[in-house]
Amino acid sequence: MSQRALRSVNGALGWVTLWCIAITSALLWPLFTNGYLLTRSGVSTPHSYITPSALGIGDTLSCSVPQDTFIAIVSHFMDGGLAVKILLFLALIFAGLGAAGLGWYFLFPATRGQALTQGLAAATFGIWNPFVVERLLQGHWSLLLCYGALPWIALTGTMVMSTGHYTRLTAWAALTASMALAGFTPTGAIMGILFALLSVGLPKRPIDVSELRLAIDHTSTPLKYWQ
């Protein structure tokens, strides 16, 4: 990303983050009251325990590994229901910021206004969409945690082939962390692997059209004197 685009993004990042918090709060406001998440598949309790089913070694195939094990461990230190609320809230914020990051990376905002417009639009779509609402109604909070990691997998996956040494190292570290977050459920792990393979295999970031035109203008200017 060019220095101009980077400055534009830095100027808009704070406002986009606040917007992500605002629309996530509007979407999850019922969870701010007392009580626990009890919606279809989403059942949270103050305390959970490590059982054979939570470890995936029970009589039936478990589709909630390792989320049940993680919550069982966390519930020994804090309220398990509160932990689920916090994770769900952060997941949607990460989804919005990840969507905004993808937009900035590929669209090259030239001004702070462009970066703000792109970021707000992408973040809104990343958080407030039919998929998220449906998963909330089904109680699939852990799948939404994986969903929040997918934009970051796509973003960091496209950056691991960067020419900069430190950029590659940072991208690999961020990609590994995002993959671990996506692996909170088996479905999320599969989606994370697919996203990583697709993003790493994609061509490099497109050329900044405005900078390309500027370079052409500077290059072609001396030729005008020969015409």
Where are these regions (language model features)?
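Start-transfer (signal-anchor) and selected internal transmembrane alpha helices
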Residues: 1-29, 217, 221-226
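Juxtamembrane loop-transmembrane helix junctions in multi-pass integral membrane proteins
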Residues: 8, 78-85, 110-113, 183
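Alpha-helical transmembrane segments of integral membrane proteins
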Residues: 11, 15-18, 85-92, 117-120
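Membrane-embedded helix bundles of polyisoprenyl
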Residues: 20, 96-106, 115-206, 227
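Membrane-interface coil-to-helix junctions
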Residues: 21-99, 124-147
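Transmembrane helix-loop junctions in multipass membrane proteins, especially transporters and channels
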Residues: 32-36, 40, 163, 204-208
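Membrane-interface segments at the starts/ends of alpha-helical transmembrane spans
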Residues: 76, 176-178, 220-222
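Short, basic, low-complexity termini and linkers enriched in Ser/Thr/Gly/Pro
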Residues: 204-221
